[in-house]
């Protein structure tokens, strides 16, 4: 009954999505799901928007060789998220806020957003780690580095294995002149080029900087998570006001 009451009065829903994948030996496999879940708990305290159960699995092609990683792939994730949104659309949802914890999910989420627009709705994709960079450039970080490690410390310090934090980041270069700088990125003569490789061919333990996890603190994580949650609450209030027909129309 409460769901029916909600959709008679509201058309906005919030869905979390993450992944189960390696984030280095120091971090839990569920990092990308734990962080959105924690943010949703914070948001629920200040917002009346309907929050759906988090989708814990994502598209994690390059990391799937690490033990414990669970990969749906971009196509299946697109189908799963699409079905979830279709069901909610049937009940009256028209504004979909997707709180995303994993970069590999972005292509699938974008496709669902295009589908929703064609049906008369609108989707907002909130990639928490990118948003945090805009809120404070000092928070900018890479996969399993200081930013994500700080977030997990802010949630539960016992989830970070401090014995595995120390040590330099080791990236496997493509050659003496093609230097690895990220998951797929390499640098040659000051220019970035992408050479897709499975992550075990790039990093020795699953995390990629440039920020080091040893820079993370619990205080940093708590402040970053609270700031992000507060922003999302504010954003959703503005998102509710959007004229969908005008925003998604072709007249400028």
How should each PLM-predicted stretch be described?
Residues 1-75, 79-95, 103-252:
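Extended, histidine- and acidic-residue-enriched regions that form the cofactor-binding/catalytic faces
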């Amino acid at each position: 009954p409460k769901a029916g009451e909600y959709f008679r009065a509201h058309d906005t829903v919030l869905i979390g999505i993450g992944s189960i994948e390696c984030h280095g030996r120091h971090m839990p496999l569920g990092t990308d799901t734990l962080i959105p879940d924690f943010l949703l708990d914070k948001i629920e305290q200040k917002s009346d928007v309907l929050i759906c159960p988090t989708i814990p699995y994502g598209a994690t092609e390059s990391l799937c060789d690490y033990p414990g990683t669970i990969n749906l792939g971009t196509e299946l994730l697109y189908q799963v998220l699409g079905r979830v949104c279709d069901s909610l659309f049937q009940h009256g949802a028209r504004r979909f806020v997707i709180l995303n914890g994993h970069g590999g999910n972005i292509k699938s989420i974008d496709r669902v957003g295009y589908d929703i627009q064609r049906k008369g709705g609108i989707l907002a994709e909130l990639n928490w780690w990118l948003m945090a960079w805009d809120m404070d450039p000092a928070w900018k970080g890479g996969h399993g580095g200081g930013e994500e490690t700080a977030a997990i410390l802010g949630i539960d310090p016992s989830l970070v294995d401090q014995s595995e934090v120390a040590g330099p980041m080791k990236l496997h270069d493509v050659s003496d002149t093609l230097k690895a700088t990220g998951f797929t990125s390499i640098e040659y003569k000051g220019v970035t080029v992408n050479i897709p490789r499975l992550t075990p061919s790039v990093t020795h333990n699953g995390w990629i900087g440039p920020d080091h996890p040893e820079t993370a603190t619990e205080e940093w994580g708590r402040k970053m998570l609270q700031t992000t949650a507060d922003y999302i609450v504010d954003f959703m209030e503005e998102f509710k006001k959007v004229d969908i027909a005008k925003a998604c129309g072709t007249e400028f």
